[in-house]
Amino acid sequence: MALLTAAARLLGTKNASCLVLAARHASASSTNLKDILADLIPKEQARIKTFRQQHGKTVVGQITVDMMYGGMRGMKGLVYETSVLDPDEGIRFRGFSIPECQKLLPKAKGGEEPLPEGLFWLLVTGHIPTEEQVSWLSKEWAKRAALPSHVVTMLDNFPTNLHPMSQLSAAVTALNSESNFARAYAQGISRTKYWELIYEDSMDLIAKLPCVAAKIYRNLYREGSGIGAIDSNLDWSHNFTNMLGYTDHQFTELTRLYLTIHSDHEGGNVSAHTSHLVGSALSDPYLSFAAAMNGLAGPLHGLANQEVLVWLTQLQKEVGKDVSDEKLRDYIWNTLNSGRVVPGYGHAVLRKTDPRYTCQREFALKHLPNDPMFKLVAQLYKIVPNVLLEQGKAKNPWPNVDAHSGVLLQYYGMTEMNYYTVLFGVSRALGVLAQLIWSRALGFPLERPKSMSTEGLMKFVDSKSG
């Protein structure tokens, strides 16, 4: 698929469209995702086997002392199939950019945003799905969505001061009682069948996550009111927003966009790497994903959009709502000179404006152009990058996804900032579980890198320099 995409770009728009359509219909003969995977996996296994036989000893990169002390930043050490993050272009899902996904992925009737089901199909197969395939996936998830009674009881008895992410992680861990993989492994299943059970568990978990997340929301913020029943005629996002208690069509559209663009961001981020690592021990998808959610709950990973909103609210308190560019510029400089950062700006990998920010900005320009908070975000977009460039410290002065998402959620009435990371988690399931299926299909082994002590590292460096 990546080769088709690259070739399409080289051949120009007209031929590109033909190639994309060819790729789209290459897997259009079936609406059963598992059947399509069963056809794709042996071919990919053979391709990688040949590649490793020919190039297994090829050196990919060098590791420096700074990389080891610096969070392994920039170290090439993982194979992650579903997405790749380009510093200049942003995320590509199986070779497709966000604008391409917005254009090509199927949409709900009367909707304009891509359906997350379509993105999951793309992440798993490498192909843009048909509307029929996406409809099959929506119905399949609806069919698998019911929660076991012990998980419902557990959620209903959590104290209201327990953080929503702690509740999500605990509930997903408890869903491990339903794991097909864990039961089959205990009975001695063949390694060649691992992916099939991981697929079943992943499909079940993705189907159940909106129910878990909605129950958490209702218990914490809506006095424990019921989430209602899943409607098999609605898509995954629409059922989710219904269960949350939101009926605004635009909010459902925003949710479709949000769940699509937050789904995957290559394999080195904390949640994706955690899922990959825990899964490599043959922990089932429930345990692997729960571990990923504990990583996402960390303030350096999943809480950034909350920090942006807190900063924006504080900014408005201090300088007022109708602030001039000059006053705003002074406020930003005061923030930087006090040793703080401007939340929502910069990224560990990206060196341009995050395309996830851009598509949210376009949504806001279309649906809420006069919202005061959006106007402030748009004003910051004009000013902050220039200030950061003047300061000269930031490698990337441009806004990331977190600079915008919270403002959109607030506009539609979801003001409970502690809950935002749960939405992020529901979305991230699409990416990390698609990869988990492929990790078992390709037989990736237990992850076990070599560690060194500072003393050992110093001796090693001395031996090299001597």
UniProtKB/Swiss-Prot annotation:
Residues found modified as N6-succinyllysine? K57, K76, K103, K193, K321, K327, K375, K393, K450, K459
A GO term, aspect molecular function: identical protein binding
The domain of life for this entry's organism is Eukaryota
Q: Which InterPro entries match?
A: Citrate_synth-like_lrg_a-sub, Citrate_synth-like_sm_a-sub, Citrate_synthase, Citrate_synthase_AS, Citrate_synthase_euk, Citrate_synthase_sf
Q: In which pathway does it act?
A: Carbohydrate metabolism; tricarboxylic acid cycle; isocitrate from oxaloacetate: step 1/2
Q: Where is this motif: SIFI-degron?
A: 2-21
**Positions modified as N6-acetyllysine?**
K76, K321, K327, K375, K382, K393, K459
Q: State the Gene Ontology BP annotations.
A: carbohydrate metabolic process; citrate metabolic process; tricarboxylic acid cycle
SUPFAM superfamilies associated with the record: Citrate synthase (SSF48256)
Name the UniProt key words of this record, in alphabetical order: Acetylation, Methylation, Mitochondrion, Transferase, Transit peptide, Tricarboxylic acid cycle, Ubl conjugation
Q: Where does oxaloacetate bind?
A: R356, R428, R448
Any idea which residues the transit peptide spans? 1-27
Catalytic machinery residues: H301, H347, D402
Catalytic function, reaction form: oxaloacetate + acetyl-CoA + H2O = citrate + CoA + H(+)
PTM summary: Methylated. Trimethylation at Lys-395 by CSKMT decreases citrate synthase activity. In response to mitochondrial stress, the precursor protein is ubiquitinated by the SIFI complex in the cytoplasm before mitochondrial import, leading to its degradation. Within the SIFI complex, UBR4 initiates ubiquitin chain that are further elongated or branched by KCMF1.
UniProt-annotated location(s): Mitochondrion matrix
Q: What is its main location?
A: mitochondrion
Report the protein's function: Key enzyme of the Krebs tricarboxylic acid cycle which catalyzes the synthesis of citrate from acetyl coenzyme A and oxaloacetate.
Misc. comment: Citrate synthase is found in nearly all cells capable of oxidative metabolism.
Q: How does it assemble?
A: Homodimer.
Which protein family is it in?
Answer: Belongs to the citrate synthase family.
Protein name listed in UniProt: Citrate synthase, mitochondrial
State the organism of origin.
Homo sapiens
Could you read off the lineage of the organism from its UniProt record?
Answer: Eukaryota, Metazoa, Chordata, Craniata, Vertebrata
Gene field: CS
